[in-house]
C-alpha cells in the first residue's frame, strides 16, 4: 500500500490494483487530471475537501470510479 499526500486534506491511496482519492479540495491541485481512479471519497462539503469546480471534472475523467460522499456533497457531484 502506498499513501501519497497531494496537499492539504487530499491523499491518494494505492493498493494492488486499486486507487482511491480522498478529499480532492481546492487547497490542493496535484489531484487535478488524475485518471484510472477506482473510487473518490469526500468526507464533507467544505471547499478544502470538495472543490466545487474541479470535482465534477475529476468524476467525468473517471467515469467508472465509485463515488462515496457525505450527504451535503451530493449536489456538487450530481
Q: Whereabouts are the PLM-identified features?
A:
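Conserved beta-strand hairpin/beta-sheet module of binuclear metal-dependent hydrolase folds
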Residues: 1-35, 39
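Active-site metal-binding motif and surrounding structural segment of the metallo-beta-lactamase
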Residues: 26-73
Amino acid at each position: 500500500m502506498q499513501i501519497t499526500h497531494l496537499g492539504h486534506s487530499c491523499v491518494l491511496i494505492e493498493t494492488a490494483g486499486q486507487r482511491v482519492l480522498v478529499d480532492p479540495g481546492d487547497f490542493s491541485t496535484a489531484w487535478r487530471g488524475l485518471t484510472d481512479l477506482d473510487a473518490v471519497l469526500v468526507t464533507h462539503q467544505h471547499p478544502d475537501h470538495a472543490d466545487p469546480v474541479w470535482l465534477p471534472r475529476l468524476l467525468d475523467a473517471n467515469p467508472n470510479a465509485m463515488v462515496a460522499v457525505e450527504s451535503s456533497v451530493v449536489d456538487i457531484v450530481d
